[in-house]
Amino acid sequence: MNPLEAKFKTSALRSWKTDQADAHKLACLGPTLKQTGNLPIHELIFFELRERVRFHLEIENEQNRLKFQILELLHQTFPGLERLFSSRYSIIALNIAEIFTHPDMVLDIDKDVLITHIFNSTDKGMSMDKATKYALQLRVIAQESYPNVDRHSFLVEKLRLLIQQLKQSIHHLKQLDDAMIQLAQQLDYFENIHSIPGIGKLSTAMIIGEIGDIKRFKSNKQLNAFVGIDIKRYQSGHTHCRDTINKRGNKKARKLLFG
């Protein structure tokens, strides 16, 4: 039974909302429903993909929480460090922030040692010239930084622990995403969705996981309504409102497609 359809069919002029009244309305609605066949049993792959997508989104939310906490702590232990790299949450940026959680830790070591730390902070290729450039920038930031706490504060230790948690979460999420992509590639229409400009392999796997078996939709209109991007139009007399989408469908699927 479609919940929205049931709501329309059981609505009345008099508003009376109780659990007992709802059960009575649904019981009265039952005999009027047409007999339908059993719902198709989706293959295990769609269930697995959906659960993987939901877990991916949970981990992303947890990572966003960690990022917010890390940035707040950095403003107290090492203000300005977030300016060193364009991507403040890249692996190299997190590695540097984990090693140098306080400006005194930068100023107390030799320049060559600092360059070596930066050079070894990424698995990707980095030239020694670029590492030297980052080392000089880091020294300038450390000299201009005025932290709220000293290097022995608990906040320094807390920051380091949160960075370690975020790095582990990023590593685990990458492994889970690779497995999800491999699972989704078993479907014959994976490449069809992946061929759409702007949709990568991970997005393709997550879209399939959230929507399910796309072949069960008989038309694009049904798919649009399921996602909630079908058009909502309002016109009354000389009033013509701008068309909007209904947003009654799967909000997670909408986020994957347009977020």
Where are these regions (language model features)?
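A detector of single, family-specific signature residues
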Residues: 1-259
